[in-house]
Swiss-Prot record:
Family of the protein in this entry: Belongs to the LysR transcriptional regulatory family.
UniProtKB keywords: Activator, DNA-binding, Nodulation, Plasmid, Transcription, Transcription regulation
InterPro entries: LysR-type_TF (IPR050389), LysR_subst-bd (IPR005119), Tscrpt_reg_HTH_LysR (IPR000847), WH-like_DNA-bd_sf (IPR036388), WH_DNA-bd_sf (IPR036390)
PANTHER family found in the cross-reference section: HTH-TYPE TRANSCRIPTIONAL REGULATOR LEUO-RELATED (PTHR30118), TRANSCRIPTIONAL REGULATORY PROTEIN (PTHR30118:SF15)
Transcription in keyword set: yes
Record protein name field: HTH-type transcriptional regulator SyrM 2
Stated role: Acts in trans to stimulate nod gene expression.
Alphabetized GO MF terms: DNA binding; DNA-binding transcription factor activity
Pfam families: HTH_1, LysR_substrate
Record-annotated HTH lysR-type domain positions: 32-89
DNA-binding region in chain numbering: 49-68
C-alpha cells in the first residue's frame, strides 16, 4: 500500500502538539524546497516537461530532476505517460486545485510592491492641532492616490506618546522632537520659526514695531497638547516676560479671534502663512529674534521595516516638502505686495 507523504522516510517530520492534531505528524517546512511548487505548477499546466521547463526558465534535465524530487516529496507519481502525453494522477489533480491559491498567497507575502493600493487599515498620527492644519492638506490627497483604503486618524500629542508608540496605540508622532530615544527613530520634516499674527488693520502696525509695542499688546496663545517636550511650540512667549495670555483651545479659533480683536498671536510661521490666506490677518516677525526649531516625525523601531509604515513615512515627508515650497512662494508674494 502506498504511504502518504508524511510517512515517507525521506521527508523530515515534526509533531503538531495541538489538541486537534495531537497524534498527526506534519512535514517540517525547513526541509521543503518551496521552489519545487513553482515547477509543479508549470508541470501541471503544460503536462510536458520541455514546455514546463521553458516556462520557468529551466533546462529540460533540470525539470526532469525537479519532477523526481516532487514525486519523492508527495510520494506519488504525479504525472505518468499516456497516449497523448503526461497524465496527472488523482493526487496531482487534487494538488492542481490547491496550488494556485497557495502560490498566489506566497507571491503576495514576499512581494514588496504588491497590493499597496489594496491596503486596508487605520493609521493613527499624534500631532499638535496646528501641525494637522499644516500637513494634512498636502498628505491626504497623496494618500488618496496611492493607498486610498487607508484611514487616517489624528489625535492630540498627549503625554505618554512614546509609550503609546511602543504599544502600538499610535503609529506616528509629529512635533518638536529632539534626538530619538533608544528604540525609536526620527526623521526631520522641516524647520520653522515663530511669527506674529495681528488683524490686517491693527493700530500697532502703524507704530514702530518694537519690544515695547509688542509687550503692550494683549496676547493670545494656544493650549499646549503635551508636557513632555513634543508639542510645546508656544513657549517663546516666556522669553518676553509677558503676563499670561488668553489661552484658546485650537489655532483656528485663535486666528478668528485675533482677526476680530486687538489681540496678537505668536505661532509657527507655517501656520501663520496658512491661516493668513483664509482670514484678514497680517504676519509680522517678532521684535526679538527667536531660535528656529525643527518639526520631526518619530516612530518605534518595531515598525521600521513594515512595508505600509515605510510608504506612509515617505508620503509624510513628501507632504512636508510640498508645504515648504508653498510657504516659500507665499512669503515671496507677500514681500512683493509689501514693496
Amino acid at each position: 500500500m502506498d504511504q502518504p507523504a508524511w510517512k515517507n522516510p525521506r521527508t523530515a517530520l515534526i509533531v503538531d502538539g495541538s489538541d486537534a492534531a495531537r497524534q498527526r505528524r506534519i512535514p517540517n517546512l525547513a526541509s521543503v524546497d518551496l521552489n519545487l511548487l513553482v515547477e509543479l505548477e508549470a508541470l501541471l499546466q503544460y503536462r510536458n516537461i520541455t514546455h514546463a521547463a521553458q516556462h520557468v526558465g529551466r533546462s529540460q534535465p533540470a525539470m526532469s530532476r525537479a519532477l523526481s524530487r516532487l514525486r519523492d516529496m508527495f510520494n506519488d507519481d504525479l504525472l505518468v505517460r499516456g497516449s497523448s502525453g503526461l497524465v496527472p494522477t488523482p493526487q496531482a489533480e487534487h494538488l492542481a486545485q490547491m496550488l494556485p491559491s497557495v502560490l498566489n498567497a506566497i507571491r503576495e507575502l514576499v512581494s514588496c510592491s504588491s497590493g499597496l493600493r489594496d491596503l486596508r487599515s487605520k493609521v493613527t498620527m499624534a500631532m499638535p492641532d496646528h501641525q494637522s492644519l499644516v500637513l494634512l492638506p498636502y498628505l491626504l490627497p497623496r494618500l488618496g492616490e496611492r493607498v486610498p483604503h487607508v484611514d487616517i486618524v489624528t489625535e492630540p500629542l498627549l503625554d505618554g506618546a512614546l509609550r503609546r508608540l511602543e504599544q502600538g496605540e499610535i503609529d506616528f508622532a509629529i512635533g518638536q522632537i529632539g534626538a530619538a530615544p533608544p528604540g525609536y527613530l526620527r526623521r526631520g520634516l522641516y524647520a520653522d520659526r515663530f511669527t506674529c499674527l495681528l488683524r490686517h488693520d491693527h493700530p500697532a502696525l502703524e507704530q514702530e514695531w518694537s519690544v515695547g509695542t509688542f509687550a503692550a499688546l494683549r496676547h493670545a496663545s494656544i493650549a499646549s497638547d503635551s508636557n513632555e517636550g513634543l508639542g510645546q511650540v508656544y513657549d517663546g512667549l516666556v522669553r518676553f516676560g509677558l503676563p499670561g495670555p488668553i489661552v484658546v483651545s485650537n489655532v483656528l479659533t485663535a486666528a478668528v479671534v485675533v482677526a476680530m480683536t486687538d489681540l496678537v498671536l505668536m505661532i509657527p510661521n507655517r501656520v501663520a502663512t496658512r491661516v493668513a490666506t483664509m482670514l484678514p490677518l497680517a504676519i509680522v516677525d517678532p521684535p526679538v529674534e527667536l531660535k528656529p526649531y525643527e518639526v520631526a516625525l518619530i516612530w518605534h523601531q518595531r515598525c521600521h521595516h513594515d512595508l505600509e509604515h515605510r510608504v506612509l513615512r515617505r508620503e509624510i515627508a513628501a507632504a512636508a516638502r510640498m508645504g515648504r515650497l508653498d510657504v516659500s512662494q507665499d512669503q515671496r508674494a507677500r514681500r512683493q505686495n509689501d514693496s
